[in-house]
Amino acid sequence: MVILITGATHTGKTFLTQRLLEKYNYPYLSVDHLKMGLIRSGNTCLTPLDDEELTLYLWPILREMIKTVIENHQNLIVEGCYIPFDWRQSFEVEYQKDIRFICITMSENYIENHYSEIIKNASIIESRLDDNDCSVEFLQRENRFYREGFCGYGENVSLIDGDYEVWLNEVLTGESFL
């Protein structure tokens, strides 16, 4: 089984991934690690700021890795921002049966009311080098972008709008991953 975890920045994708790793013992692939490896090795001229181009560049690689994992009856969590809204179109139905998907977004009110907590927890799993451009407005815009994009393709989007720990426990105890 493959679990795809995507969503806006600062929504807790990596934290959720870590908790799923602990619960299911599934290995995980951080798309950010793959991205930075390709950039730092000189295998692409793209930069970390080239979000749209990175999605186009990384998705064919990720897609084929996901297919290989499924064909080998293995498990993997794939976590990161670079999953296209129309990702399902890349897989035949037989593959889709072995893929679970979650897109995490936060409501505008949640961001406004919990901004300091969001920033405080930004590096809970991985270190962020620079969060200076991460304003309330930026986070609201990013979350709206992901919510509208994935909903536009009929995907369910998990909305954090209340207590984060309650949301996290609901996701972890839900049936959506098995």
Protein language model features and the residues they cover:
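Conserved Walker
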Residues: 15
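A glycine- and Lys/Arg-enriched "phosphate-lid" helix/loop adjacent to the NTP-binding pocket
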Residues: 99-144
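Conserved substrate/cofactor phosphate-moiety recognition/catalytic segment
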Residues: 18-61
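The conserved Walker
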Residues: 9
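Glycine-rich phosphate-binding loop used to anchor ATP phosphates in small-molecule kinases
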Residues: 54-98, 102-106
